[in-house]
Amino acid sequence: MKKYENTGSKDTRSGFGAGMTELGQKNENVVALCADLIGSLKFDDFKKNHPERFFQIGIAEANMIGIAAGLTIGGKIPFTGTFANFSTGRVYDQIRQSVAYSDKNVKICASHAGLTLGEDGATHQILEDIGLMKMLPGMTVINTCDYNQTKAATIAIADHHGPVYLRFGRPVVPNFMPSDEPFVIGKAILLNEGTDVTIVATGHLVWEALLAAEALEARGISAEVINIHTIKPLDDEAILKSVGKTGCVVTAEEHNILGGLGESVARVLALNTPKPQEFVAVNDSFGESGTPEQLMEKYKLNNQAIVEAVERVIKRK
């Protein structure tokens, strides 16, 4: 298969900003709402080019969600933007009541997700947001892996009717997905074919999964790597097809072990074809302050942790 290479590291939030810039030019119904974080969400170009479609709500996230829900009634497609912690935990009641329950066409765009927010620490990091959002009926949940995929996802969700949670991050990470790769909601992407183990990864852990596959190949272990950008609806077919071939799976995510991708995959397997599974995720704890690199190592969210999980799960086949 094609070998994926880092074409130049970028932050995924800049991919979101680039997607918003393109949407601003293409779709006059797209509007942006920001909770006092224009630079952090990379809304600068959209605000400059379309000031009449940009709304600075301030540090009033609950109001932002309510306003966004109202704008959909007039045919607008609102994209809200703030940190992932404030996009979910702080406004969960408003999302449930005003957006999800009434199936409003709001795009909840959440930057600085996971541990890799870094030095701001546990009060600003969030590791439970995927679980919160995937439990809401009708909510589509997307977690992108690099700049190119985040840009493509941002553009794609504008054409999807219904509430969407789009999750991306702050740090600079490898950019390896092709810029012309189609983004299809709910369809996994097979990155590397293998026969011994399936690695199902999402977000920043996708690149780490590819690095792990290289290391495993040197040890004589053939790893299949699947990029799951859409947590809900999950591509059950792709997972079952791969695990049916390899006989075991490792899930990898920058999220709590409870409520995330790993649990969704476990449910699919339990209902269809139970197989050994190992989880690479945060073991039910809050984060802390540190550089992204320090935190990913401490909480075992890197390629070495994936390799170790693969070695464990293969022994259980």
Segment roles from a protein language model:
Residues M1-R167, V172, P182, ...:
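Thiamine diphosphate
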